[in-house]
Amino acid sequence: MISRKSLITASILITCLMAVATSALADEQGFSVEAWGQSFKSAVKAKNSQEMLNLLDMKVLEKSALTCVDCSTKEKLQTARKLFAKKQFDQSLELYNQIPKGTDYWFQAVEEKGWNYFRQNDSEKALAQSKTLLSPQFSEVVGTEAYFLQSLTQLKICDYKGIFATHEMFKEKQKGRVVDVQKLASTGMNEAFAKVVAKADLFPLVAKDLGDSFLHLPVLYYKDLELQGQLLKFKVSQKALEVLKAEDGGMLKLQATLDKMNQDSFKKMKARLATLAEDETKENSKIVQKLNLIEVEAIQRIHTDLSLSKDLYSKGKFKDTQEDQLVFMDDGRPWIDELDKFEVSAKACPQGIRRKM
């Protein structure tokens, strides 16, 4: 019987391999700690002090190891976001659609396409994006906002049964990772990241080399340059110490320097991961509050027999508002909560299908 862990890992690998050319490019440009170790070993054997110092120049190493293999994709995503902010939805969609499947930013592109369609009142296409993200292959590794997108869109079309199903899926698929990330904000280390550290060899880090760590760590944690830089220092100093001790070449002063680098980089690596986890935990907390708010609204609509005019339910438009407001069209009263600088007027449904259960 195939285990859940194996299934998730296989799904992640399939996703990563959807863009074979991109992955191959990353490998070709990758920096290998093992290969570096062989060069360092040769320099130690030859007692070539200058070559050893050159190999231990971390500024040079970071520049060569942490190359940007998806800069154009990231730039397209950033430009698409700027266009979206300007309400140039068609132009932003054009760029989102250019982000290839299997790249590190594809999940974000699909989610943001969903919000694009949502703002254009195209609920069908918004749901198409969210359902892609919440498919069995991806539902445990995408960010929590994908669930908010689907839930809010379902509220907009009065699919109350769908809302409760989405929230149940959120609890089932995301609770474990949300809790793990919350704990990580305090510790900076867990079993999943310890495995990543132990196995890390190629830089920059790529998704296909990270196994099932996505289930227990912040979204796109491996794209953070500061984290990668500290991990690189840790791995290089660790490898250099192994070589020096194996060759028994003395160099106690160099060993002491490397040992300090190793310890410092490990502490900074943990601190950075804790910061990433803390940031994501704050966002996750907001998402949970939003989902709770939507659920309360759905329950209120189901159990309260309000008489609403067709005119009230005919527009369903969105408008700019003050920070942290969500307004439903049932009575126009604002719900103040940890919401992200926008107000939503939920699109109403025809009276006959309003209570879709």
Where are these regions (language model features)?
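Extracytoplasmic/secretory-pathway proteins
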Residues: 29-32, 36-43, 52-55, 159-357
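Solenoid-like repeat scaffolds
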Residues: 31, 60-69, 97-105, 132-140, ...
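"A position-specific structural signal for the A-helix of alpha-solenoid helical repeats
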Residues: 37-41, 77-78, 112, 148-149, ...
